[in-house]
């Protein structure tokens, strides 16, 4: 346990240093340089903390004389990691949707209505939300209005296709059931999803979304594949994390404060991601309409 605790301490100190450096970069309007390393350190710390909590629980059951003192030390480490997770979100999440693009302003109201009730109403996937509404039918109806919507054009040249699907969590880690004495699983799950969503949005924003994109048909295929095969499972993971968090809050777990903070951060990041997906859908439709005007005999599909 001592070796793991020492590594967590090192991760905390390294994370603190990187956060301070990027905070200074942000104040000076410079690029943030340490997001990936900071996320990796926090992820490692949370995995180690999970094992430490299990070990100290075993020591307590065996009535080890230092179990209580060790548990206090681990709880202090956990509080520090949780605080750094909150600082990570506050520092890096603002990079996801740059205000200068106006994405949130143009689309926030419509997408916000989809997620305000607690992420229970999927935008796509054709299954019922609140009241049994067919969201797939709604999405098709919205498609008829796309040519009249203003184009949102995330800038930058990069890979043209939709991001690769995020890998599913491995056993025992990310989306674990929330039971008394096991807050780390839910917190780790939220942190993992926050990191994954931020990475997805970063990659989307780096794609070529100009009206003259090289391969709109290929981009459309990748995007439709994501909607049909990946979006629903990702939404289910987010919903499961929300259920786990609610369960622990209802059980009045001592870590209710950090749990609620992580839940709110995840809810906001998921809404941002849906907003950006709507931007993709809108811009793809505009590019396809533009191609049909230029070449009436061709089809983007």
From Swiss-Prot:
<feature type="compositionally biased region" description="Polar residues">
    <location>
        <begin position="26"/>
        <end position="41"/>
    </location>
</feature>
<protein>
    <recommendedName>
        <fullName>Envoplakin-like protein</fullName>
    </recommendedName>
</protein>
<feature type="region of interest" description="Disordered">
    <location>
        <begin position="118"/>
        <end position="166"/>
    </location>
</feature>
<feature type="compositionally biased region" description="Basic and acidic residues">
    <location>
        <begin position="136"/>
        <end position="151"/>
    </location>
</feature>
<dbReference type="InterPro" id="IPR055419">
    <property type="entry name" value="Spectrin_PEPL/EVPL"/>
</dbReference>
<comment type="similarity">
    <text>Belongs to the plakin or cytolinker family.</text>
</comment>
<feature type="region of interest" description="Disordered">
    <location>
        <begin position="18"/>
        <end position="41"/>
    </location>
</feature>
<keyword id="KW-0175">Coiled coil</keyword>
<dbReference type="Pfam" id="PF23160">
    <property type="entry name" value="Spectrin_1st_PEPL"/>
</dbReference>
<dbReference type="InterPro" id="IPR043197">
    <property type="entry name" value="Plakin"/>
</dbReference>
<feature type="coiled-coil region">
    <location>
        <begin position="1"/>
        <end position="88"/>
    </location>
</feature>
<dbReference type="GO" id="GO:0045104">
    <property type="term" value="P:intermediate filament cytoskeleton organization"/>
</dbReference>
């Amino acid at each position: 346990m001592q070796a793991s605790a020492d590594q967590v301490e090192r991760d905390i100190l390294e994370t603190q240093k990187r956060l301070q450096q990027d905070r200074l970069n942000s104040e000076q309007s410079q690029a943030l340089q340490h997001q990936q390393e900071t996320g990796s350190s926090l992820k490692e710390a949370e995995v180690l903390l999970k094992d430490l909590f299990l070990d100290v629980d075993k020591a307590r059951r065996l009535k080890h004389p230092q179990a209580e003192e060790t548990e206090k030390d681990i709880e202090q480490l956990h509080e520090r990691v949780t605080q750094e997770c909150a600082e990570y979100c506050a520092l890096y999440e603002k990079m996801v949707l740059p205000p200068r693009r106006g994405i949130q302003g143009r689309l926030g109201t419509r997408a916000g209505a989809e997620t305000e009730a607690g992420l229970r109403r999927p935008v796509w996937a054709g299954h019922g939300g609140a009241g049994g509404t067919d969201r797939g039918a709604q999405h098709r109806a919205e498609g008829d209005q796309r040519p009249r919507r203003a184009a949102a054009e995330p800038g930058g040249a990069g890979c043209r296709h939709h991001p690769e699907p995020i890998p599913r969590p491995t056993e025992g880690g990310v989306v674990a059931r929330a039971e008394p004495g096991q807050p780390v699983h839910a917190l780790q799950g939220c942190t993992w999803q926050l990191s994954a969503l931020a990475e997805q949005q970063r990659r989307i924003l780096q794609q070529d979304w100009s009206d003259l994109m090289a391969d709109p048909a290929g981009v459309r295929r990748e995007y439709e594949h994501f909607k049909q095969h990946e979006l629903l499972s990702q939404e289910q993971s987010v919903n499961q994390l929300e259920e786990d968090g609610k369960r622990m809050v209802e059980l009045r777990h001592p870590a209710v404060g950090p749990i609620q903070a992580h839940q709110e951060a995840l809810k906001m990041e998921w809404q941002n991601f849906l907003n950006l997906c709507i931007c993709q859908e809108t811009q793809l439709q505009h590019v396809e309409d533009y191609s049909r005007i230029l070449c009436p005999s061709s089809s983007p599909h």
